[in-house]
């Protein structure tokens, strides 16, 4: 079994074989239990800081039966609110992104400042309990930022995000994820429960079938040069419930070199990108992994990859896959989360970037 040289197993290695009832994937009753006991108490990654850089910029995100507003404040901080007027429950906006000083209720015209305070209500003097502008605010949601992402928690007494993430906090800081730019984003409506999607990204058993190379020249290796054999993968589970898979990468079939074969794409392209000639490379197949690591160490800083100095050699080539409880996954450079349907346990949404 593969064991990373620089990444020890996370502390919780006691994986129990507990059967899972299929009703968890199609039961309305179980879906309601998730909304009662889980969703209101977990940290949810819902936004990206760079999407709302200036004061008054906001991002709206629907999640299951709830809708949230993430709003940049004058001091640069971000506040999050339920996207609902506190008067009669009307939705404040349907726009995914925007800029505003006030959120105006489309029903009775109440105006809420970007910091959540009510500043205008029609006929405010007619309310027997007094002017609502004196004491009403939008319902605020606990908010933190990390790695350039906006995280919210509906539980005001929830632990800090750093405590929730556990070992992921330090590992992600090394990548300087806060500097990442999003170039592609899409949302897919899925005819399945939200957990099925996460189950898929939480195991590598399907890779040899779904992602098998077109030319079956190797036992268990994807075209990208990622070794998908469980013997070459480190599986970890943290005490916080998050998972990590480390799959060795950056090399081709050893037999092809020994038999005078050639290094094929995409590995050949990766080598050329780092000034290694695949046609004149000598050595066994696994040696390309070390060669790419050394080339990235040498050339990376000159090309602007200054964060390479924060990374171990494995991180320069290998595939690090994270699944964060309950609904977020990072697979190479693809980030995705799943959102439950408001009413149907057999449906879900999958926004990704």
Annotate each language-model stretch with its function.
Residues 7-21:
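Short, contiguous pre-domain boundary segments
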Residues 185-307:
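Glycine-rich, aromatic-lined ligand/substrate-binding cores of catalytic
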Residues 51-174:
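Rieske [2Fe-2S] iron-sulfur-binding domain
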Residues 349-352:
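Hydrophobic alpha-helical segments, chiefly the membrane-spanning helices
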Residues 337-345:
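Conserved small/polar residues in nucleotide/adenosyl-binding loops
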């Amino acid at each position: 079994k593969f064991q990373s040289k620089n990444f020890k197993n996370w502390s919780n290695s006691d994986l129990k074989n507990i059967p899972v009832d299929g009703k968890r994937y199609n039961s309305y009753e179980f879906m309601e239990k998730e909304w009662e006991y889980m969703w209101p108490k977990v940290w949810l990654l819902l936004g990206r800081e760079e999407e709302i850089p200036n004061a008054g910029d906001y991002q709206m995100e629907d999640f299951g039966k709830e809708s949230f507003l993430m709003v940049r404040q004058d001091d640069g901080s971000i506040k999050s609110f339920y996207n609902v007027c506190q008067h009669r429950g009307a939705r404040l906006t349907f726009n995914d992104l925007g800029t505003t000083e006030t959120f105006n209720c489309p029903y009775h015209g109440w105006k809420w400042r970007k910091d959540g305070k009510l500043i205008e209500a029609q006929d405010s003097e007619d309310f027997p309990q007094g002017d609502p502008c004196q004491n009403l605010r939008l319902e605020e949601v606990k908010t933190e930022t990390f790695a350039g992402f906006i995280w919210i928690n509906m539980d005001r007494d929830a632990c800090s995000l750093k405590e929730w993430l556990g070992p992921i906090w330090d590992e992600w800081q090394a990548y300087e994820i806060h500097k990442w730019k999003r170039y592609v984003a899409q949302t897919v409506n899925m005819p399945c429960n939200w957990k099925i999607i996460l189950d898929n990204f939480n195991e590598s058993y399907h890779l040899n079938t779904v992602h098998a190379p077109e030319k079956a020249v190797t036992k268990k290796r994807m075209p990208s040069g990622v070794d998908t054999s469980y013997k070459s993968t480190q599986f970890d589970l943290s005490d916080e419930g998050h998972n990590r898979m480390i799959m060795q990468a950056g090399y081709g079939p050893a037999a092809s070199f020994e038999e005078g074969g050639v290094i094929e794409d995409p590995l050949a392209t990766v080598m050329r990108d780092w000034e290694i000639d695949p046609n004149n490379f000598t050595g066994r197949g696994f040696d390309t992994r070390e060669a790419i690591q050394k080339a990235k160490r040498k050339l990376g800083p000159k090309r602007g990859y200054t964060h390479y100095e924060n990374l171990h050699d494995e991180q320069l080539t290998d595939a690090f896959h994270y699944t964060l409880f309950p609904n977020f996954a990072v697979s190479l450079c693809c980030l995705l989360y799943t959102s439950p349907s408001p009413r149907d346990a057999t449906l879900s949404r999958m926004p990704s970037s």
